[in-house]
């Protein structure tokens, strides 16, 4: 089966993970990426370089201008040449409804699917960010929703088909690993949180963890965390917070006895990618509670949850003084995430199975 995966393609977690999984399943896969369209060109002067960079940043941020037109034209041309059975567009902020209509006219047998890890219908996002995607929703053959609550919302704005597609972990990157002595110095701790900052209750929760004297580490985008680590007397010791990627991300999880999982209130999350990555790493996950995440792991047996700051601190103290229980719950969570097929290859297999069943024998989509 021929599949074209389109997206920004900056991260190995998203488009690249999908691409690799589909290849593992034996399909012929091509990529279409648009982040490189916004790379600054070489200029003779520093001023020329800065003007070019500013111009491209503006077009990329506000999704206007000749570069956006070129991206859409090039996607149409690649689809015309490759003639995929499936066009899978990841976070299609840059792709317009007109483009999808053009693709459908020249390649009517191609199924066009869209997917987002962010919540494009949440009120906290700037309206301009998702305007092209939302306008194009009726032009997709199927929208894959990251969250349960988005399913009906997508239908209300014209989606033809909507199906839940949860996030995933990548077995090659998210797995138990024994840390070297040097890595233990860098990553060893009682409790870790790896993720971005949001102006929600996580600040109070993290401050309380530090206040109670637990050995805590935090990793994430510095531009997110700087706004709080420079203001909070308790969190100043962590400034500057640094991100971790690839093998270091996995080591940051494996180096902790407990890994925290907070949900994005901006995206109205009831689970997140780390819901699967933390158990896959073999570390105990202590997650913010939701009814949704409680359907995936048995509380106190395969992971644990907190609903209040007091419950969070109490459970941290319990697991740090009961090693055997902590190891047992972490191991059970690791088995659960594997048994329930939360890995990216299984996700893509489930996706293709859904498409095959939905479009029947008239489709060239095969699982």
Where are these regions (language model features)?
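A short, histidine- and acid-enriched strand-loop-helix "catalytic/donor-clamping" loop
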Residues: 110-126
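Charged, glycine-enriched surface loops/patches
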Residues: 100-114, 139
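Nucleotide-sugar donor-binding catalytic core of glycosyltransferases
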Residues: 1-52, 59, 67-77, 81-82, ...
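Conserved acidic donor-binding segment of nucleotide-sugar-dependent glycosyltransferases
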Residues: 303-309, 319-323
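N-terminal Rossmann-like NAD(P) cofactor-binding module of classical short-chain dehydrogenase/reductase
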Residues: 88
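A charged, aromatic-enriched C-terminal amphipathic alpha-helix characteristic of glycosyltransferases
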Residues: 321-353
């Amino acid at each position: 089966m021929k599949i074209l995966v389109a997206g920004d393609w900056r991260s190995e977690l998203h488009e690249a993970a999908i691409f690799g999984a589909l290849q593992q399943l034996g399909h012929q896969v091509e990529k279409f990426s648009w982040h490189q369209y916004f790379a600054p060109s070489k200029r003779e002067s520093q001023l020329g370089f800065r003007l070019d960079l500013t111009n491209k940043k503006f077009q990329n941020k506000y999704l206007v201008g000749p570069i956006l037109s070129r991206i859409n034209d090039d996607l149409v041309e690649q689809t015309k040449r490759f003639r995929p059975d499936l066009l899978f567009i990841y976070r299609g902020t840059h792709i317009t409804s007109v483009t999808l209509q053009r693709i459908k006219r020249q390649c009517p047998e191609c199924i066009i699917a869209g997917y987002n890890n962010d919540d494009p219908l949440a009120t906290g996002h700037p309206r301009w960010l998702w305007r092209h995607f939302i306008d194009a929703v009726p032009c997709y053959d199927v929208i894959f929703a990251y969250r349960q609550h988005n399913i009906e919302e997508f239908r209300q704005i014209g989606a033809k088909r909507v199906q839940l597609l949860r996030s995933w972990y990548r077995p090659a990157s998210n797995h138990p690993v024994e840390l070297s002595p040097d890595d233990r110095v860098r990553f060893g701790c009682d409790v870790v949180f790896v993720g971005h900052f949001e102006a929600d209750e996580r600040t109070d929760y993290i401050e309380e963890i530090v206040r109670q004297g637990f050995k805590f580490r935090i990793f994430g985008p510095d531009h997110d965390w700087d706004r709080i680590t420079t203001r909070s007397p308790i969190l100043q010791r962590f400034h500057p917070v640094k991100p971790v990627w690839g093998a270091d991300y996995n080591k940051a999880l494996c180096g902790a006895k407990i890994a925290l999982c907070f949900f994005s209130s901006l995206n109205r999350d009831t689970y997140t990618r780390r819901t699967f990555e933390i158990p896959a790493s073999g570390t105990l996950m202590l997650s913010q509670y939701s009814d949704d995440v409680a359907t995936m792991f048995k509380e106190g047996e395969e992971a644990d949850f907190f609903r209040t700051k007091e419950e969070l601190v109490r459970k941290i103290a319990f697991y740090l003084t009961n090693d055997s229980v902590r190891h047992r719950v972490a191991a059970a969570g690791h088995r659960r995430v594997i048994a329930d097929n939360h890995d990216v290859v299984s996700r893509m297999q489930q996706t293709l199975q859904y498409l095959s069943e939905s479009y029947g024998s008239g489709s060239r989509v095969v699982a």
